[in-house]
Amino acid sequence: MAVGLQSLLRTVVDNKASGLHIRGNSNAYVRLNGLMKPIDDSFLPNDEVKKMAYACMGERERRIFEQYSAVDFSLDAKSFGRFRFNVFRQMGKICMAIRHIPLKIPTFEELRLPGDILRKMSNTRRGLILVTGMTGSGKTSTLAAMIDHINKNRAGHILTIEDPIEFMHTDNRCIVSQLELGVDTPSYTAALRAAMRQDPDVILIGELRDPEVMRAAVGAVETGQLVLGTMHTVNVTQTLSRLVDAFPVEQHDQVRLQLSELIRGIVCQRLLPTVKPGMRPALEVLVSTPQVRKLILENKPSDLQKAMQQGEFYGMNTFDQALAHLYKEGAIDLETAQSAATSPDAIMLAIRGVSGSLDAVNE
C-alpha cells in the first residue's frame, strides 16, 4: 500500500471520520459527521492516484476494474484499521471512495442502538431478520454487532456471504465461516445453494440485492436456519413490498403467508447529524407478534404502521416516533427531524404533545 495512502487513511482514523474520497488533481476529502471536508495539503495528481489504486488491487481486482471500470474490495492497513475500497472512473480518471471499518466489532451500546430488542432478535433460532437503509446508514455495523452477539452467546456455525468481507469475525462459541463473492463463491445464490450442505445455524447475506437472492433467502429460512440480511429500502412497508414483488404475481398471497410466518424482525435505520458534532441512528422497528403476522398476511400496510406506533411494549416504533424522541432528547434539531420525517406534521404534533401520539395525523 502506498505510503501516501497510509497517511491519508491514518487521518481518517485519527479524526474518527467514516470515509475518504480521493480523485486526481484535487485534495483528498474525508467524510466527517456526514459532511465532506478537504484534507489540507493533500493535493494528488492523476498519475499518483492511479499508482495508489493499482498498488491496492490484487490481480483479480485489477482484472475486474479493467473490464468494468469499477471494483469493490477490502484491505487491512496494518494495525489501525480495515477499509472497504470502491475504485471507479469518472471522466476517464481513477477515483477511490474508501470506508473505514473498525478492527473492533462495535457493541449495540457503542452504536447507540436499542440493545435489548436487537439482542432478543439475535437470540432467535430460526427466521428472517432484515436490517435496511440507504448506503451509509450503518447497516453493516448493526449486523456485525448482531453476529458478534450470536457468536458470544450460542454454540453453532455462522456462515456469512459478503461482497466484500468487511468486519472480521473470529471463532468464539460459534465457528464462523466468511465467504467473499468472487473469491470463495461466484454469487449469493450459488453460496446459498451450497450453504445447505455446510451445516450452518446462522446465515448472513450481505445484501438481498435482486429477486433471485431474495427468493433464495426465503428458501434458506424455510429449511430451518436463522437468516440475517440487508436491503436498500427506507422503511418497513417498502421492505415487505420489495420482498413480495420478488416473486411472480400469482404467488404473492402464498409469499405473504410465508413472510408472516418467517419474519422475526425488520430494522430500518438512518444516520442523522446531531446538534453536537456527531451522528445518531434513528430506527424504525418491526417485531413479529400475532397482530403483526396477521397484518402481513392480510397486506394491510397502514394498519401495520399503527401496530408499530402502538407496539412500544414489544420494542416497536416508527421512524417519526424515533425522530421525535431524538429531538426531545436534544440530540437532533427541529430541521433535521422534519427533513427526515415520514410525516413532518406528525413530528410537530408529537413534539408538542398534541393527542399524545402520532395517531391524530395518520387516521
Feature-to-residue mapping (PLM):
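Short, flexible helix-loop junctions that flank or precede catalytic/ligand sites
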Residues: M1-E363
